Amino acid sequence: MMWVIDTSALIRLFVPDGPLHPEIETAFNRAATGADLVLAPHLLLAEAASVLLRKRRRDELSTEELRELLQAVESLPIRLCEHGPLLFPACALAEAHGLSAYDALYLAVAEQHSARLITNDEGLAKVARAIGLA
């Protein structure tokens, strides 16, 4: 099975400020054995760094914790996808469903690979369900 993970779900693995997505552990456990594939646009790394930096600036993380979490994010079995070729499909999804281009890129990756989206963003999850990607 193929999965696409967004930043909202990924960050919860490391900073438990809410419930984990019910399928995230299964997806990563299966990806670690090669049974499943977890995908994301390259954008994921920048978004994850931005969220963690924001937490660092609010003193919710130390500088060392920030570094460790960034290394942990990079070490996960996630295949990063070029998102440049997906800009037009992502913009079409964003326009049709009232999403940001950022969120729509995750849907475009999921659509391209017939994958299921793992997100903790309720608005994005609702759209993913509506178009058969959740």
Task: List each language-model region with its residue ranges.
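Short beta-strand scaffold positions
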Residues: 5, 39-40, 81, 101, ...
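Residues that scaffold the ATP/ADP-binding catalytic core of kinase and kinase-like folds
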Residues: 12-14, 51, 127
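Acidic, PIN/NYN-like endoribonuclease modules and their adjacent C-terminal/linker elements
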Residues: 1-2, 107-134
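Short glycine/serine- and small hydrophobic-enriched flexible loop segments
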Residues: 50-57, 112
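Alpha-helix capping/helix-boundary segments
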Residues: 9-10, 44, 85-86, 106, ...
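Short, well-structured N-terminal submotif of metal-dependent ribonuclease cores
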Residues: 1-43, 55-68
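Acidic catalytic patch
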Residues: 42-45, 65-96
